[in-house]
């Protein structure tokens, strides 16, 4: 039973580390051209190069209420905090 709790605790630690980005890959956003045919034409002719455009979409959030000062609610903490508390609880059970 103690071995099972130890393995479960270690696996939860690894999951949390991957989700927070410590062990995961950091990725960057790449913009792609709007039209592949326009990109090919832009490479071959000078006239098409002036008409080729790239599309970039910007997502704007609608302004809402400003954030309140102070500590956030326990429901706003997310899954990583839940896994952290579960991991701590399992460690305490393992050590007892």
UniProtKB/Swiss-Prot annotation:
Entries under InterPro entries matching the protein: CAMPATH-1
Pfam families: CD52
GO biological process, one term: positive regulation of cytosolic calcium ion concentration
Propeptide: 71-96
Cellular compartments annotated: Cell membrane
Record keywords, A-Z: Cell membrane, Glycoprotein, GPI-anchor, Lipoprotein, Membrane, Signal
Glycosylation sites: 26
Lipoprotein in keyword set: yes
Signal peptide: 1-23
Gene Ontology, cellular component aspect: plasma membrane; side of membrane; sperm midpiece
Lipid-binding residues (covalent, GPI-anchor amidated glycine): 70
Superkingdom of origin organism: Eukaryota
Role of this protein: May play a role in carrying and orienting carbohydrate, as well as having a more specific role.
Name of the protein this chain belongs to: CAMPATH-1 antigen
Organism: Rattus norvegicus (Rat)
């Amino acid at each position: 039973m103690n071995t099972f709790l130890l393995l479960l605790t270690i696996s939860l630690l690894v999951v949390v580390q991957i989700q927070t980005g410590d062990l995961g890959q950091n990725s960057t956003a790449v913009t792609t051209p709007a039209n592949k045919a326009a990109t090919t034409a832009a490479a071959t002719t000078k006239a098409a190069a002036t008409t080729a455009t790239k599309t970039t979409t910007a997502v704007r959030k609608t302004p809402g209420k400003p954030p309140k000062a102070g500590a956030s609610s326990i429901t706003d903490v997310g899954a990583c905090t839940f896994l952290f508390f579960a991991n701590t609880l399992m460690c305490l059970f393992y050590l007892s």
